[in-house]
């Protein structure tokens, strides 16, 4: 059996790692998550699958996959992309989230590549008619993502509406808003438990800044909201508009300051949620041809 190391920094939320382990493991391949290891002996592995990041030096002579699940963020994001393009070592295979990500990195070589968009775990495909909260937000809670705009709205204008916040907020954010009775912070929740909690809300908030690179990338949480059949309130940006059109879904759009977020308008809005079972992880991974790509890498290296 060949051992494949799924190597990440441990900082990012990467549901795709569990999907790879669940759907790509077989009698020939064992996938190991680096986040579950204390120390790593790279010599134990037959293939290194890296979630990028930077990778300037090749330290072991085994095949390497570079996965670019997102573009660089923060200050000088495009410059960071350029540095990665120029200085990252050349892998045997690259995986890109979508065409937008591939185009922005603009690697000028003939390394094989595949696209692997985000999928949704089976556990999110539930419908819960017992609603205990008005709104839910799942995901990153940072100043950079502008999450305080949402919290300010519910602390003041929407203080009669309950808001369930699933995830780990930055300490200063939690310290400021924990006193508001209508804002409920769950803290970090096990991934498989999220749908049971989140589905108790009537509306789900997808709050993505309309700025590079966030507006080009797939919103994992929005996909999970759709799978749970929640009524979705979202900011207006490139990717979400393309997805809405492609799937024939209808979301309630808000601006960054949430001025359009009014309960009376939501009650009158004709939400349209459709089936996205074609975006289950097993279906997404079938489309990528990843299994055959891995087989070919291993075959070339070890036969």
Pin down the residues of each PLM region.
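A short alpha->beta transition loop at the rim of the catalytic pocket in nucleotide-sugar-dependent
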Residues: 202, 229-230, 236
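Conserved catalytic-core segment of nucleotide-activated headgroup transferases in glycan assembly
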Residues: 9-20, 119-123, 130-176, 185-196
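Active-site proximal beta-strand in glycosyltransferases
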Residues: 49, 57-75
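A charged, aromatic-enriched C-terminal amphipathic alpha-helix characteristic of glycosyltransferases
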Residues: 15, 123, 253-303
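N-terminal pre-catalytic "stem/leader" segment of glycosyltransferase-like enzymes
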Residues: 1-52, 251, 299-303
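Membrane-proximal helix-turn-helix segments that form the acceptor-binding/catalytic region
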Residues: 75-96
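Donor nucleotide-sugar binding/catalytic pocket of nucleotide-sugar-dependent glycosyltransferases
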Residues: 92-125
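Nucleotide-sugar-dependent
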Residues: 142-145, 192, 206-224, 234-244
């Amino acid at each position: 059996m060949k051992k494949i190391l799924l190597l990440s920094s441990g900082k990012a939320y990467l549901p795709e790692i569990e999907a790879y382990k669940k759907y790509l493991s077989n009698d020939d391949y064992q996938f190991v998550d680096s986040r579950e290891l204390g120390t790593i002996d790279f010599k134990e592995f037959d293939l290194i699958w890296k979630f990028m990041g930077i990778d300037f030096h090749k330290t072991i002579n085994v095949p390497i996959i570079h996965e670019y699940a997102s573009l660089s963020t923060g200050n000088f994001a495009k410059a960071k992309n350029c540095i990665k393009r120029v200085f990252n070592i050349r892998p045997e295979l690259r995986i890109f989230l979508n065409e937008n990500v591939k185009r922005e990195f603009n690697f000028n070589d003939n390394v094989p590549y595949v696209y692997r968009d985000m999928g949704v775990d089976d556990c999110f495909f539930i419908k819960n008619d017992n609603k205990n909260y008005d709104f839910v937000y799942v995901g990153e809670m940072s100043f950079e993502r502008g999450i305080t705009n949402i919290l300010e709205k519910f602390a003041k204008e929407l203080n009669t509406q309950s808001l369930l916040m699933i995830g780990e907020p930055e300490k200063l954010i939690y310290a400021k808003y924990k006193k508001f009775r209508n804002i409920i912070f769950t803290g970090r929740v096990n991934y498989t438990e999220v749908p049971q909690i989140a589905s108790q809300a009537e509306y789900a908030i997808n709050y993505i800044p309309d700025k590079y690179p966030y507006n080009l990338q797939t919103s994992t949480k929005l996909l999970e909201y759709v799978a749970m059949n929640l009524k979705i309130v979202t900011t207006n940006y490139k990717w979400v508009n393309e997805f809405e059109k492609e799937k024939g879904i209808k979301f309630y759009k808000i601006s960054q300051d949430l001025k359009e977020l009014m309960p009376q308008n939501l009650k009158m809005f004709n939400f349209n949620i459709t089936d996205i079972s074609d975006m289950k992880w097993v279906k997404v991974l079938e489309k990528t041809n990843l299994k055959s790509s891995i087989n070919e890498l291993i075959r070339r290296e070890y036969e």
